[in-house]
């Protein structure tokens, strides 16, 4: 929570993944689908270890671990397939316990909700 010097306004900043929703497994499965589509076979445990990194960093780490070179063009395509595969799984995402109550409480106290992507 942050309070500005010249105002009584409050601001709350949440990292969506792991704070409000749990999407780890959906990301793992989406990355597996994307890497397989590029001909890169990886066990899910290897992908799971990299979750939390940006897509580019994750692909660099996986390339180092596997000794495979991934071009910028290939990386862009893999990330696009990941985004599409993840979107296909959106209906399986679940709000973490207490997250909705927290957001409702903030709304009841007239705390503005803003999205930052």
Kindly give the residue locations of the regions a language model identified:
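Conserved small/polar residues in nucleotide/adenosyl-binding loops
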Residues: 114-117
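Short loop/turn motifs at secondary-structure junctions and domain boundaries
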Residues: 3-5
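N-terminal helical cap/lid subdomain that shapes the substrate entry/recognition surface
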Residues: 7-16, 20-100, 105, 109-112
């Amino acid at each position: 929570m942050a309070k500005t010097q010249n105002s009584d306004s409050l601001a709350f900043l949440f990292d969506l993944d792991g704070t409000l929703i749990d999407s780890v497994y959906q990301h793992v499965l989406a990355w597996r689908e994307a890497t397989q589509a590029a001909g890169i076979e990886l066990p899910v445990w290897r992908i799971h270890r990299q979750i939390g990194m940006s897509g580019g960093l994750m692909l660099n780490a996986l390339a180092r671990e596997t000794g495979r070179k991934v071009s910028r063009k290939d990386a862009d395509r893999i990330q696009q397939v990941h985004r599409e595969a993840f979107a296909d799984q959106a209906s399986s995402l679940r709000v973490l316990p207490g997250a909705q109550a927290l957001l409702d409480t903030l709304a009841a106290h007239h705390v503005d909700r803003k999205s930052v992507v």
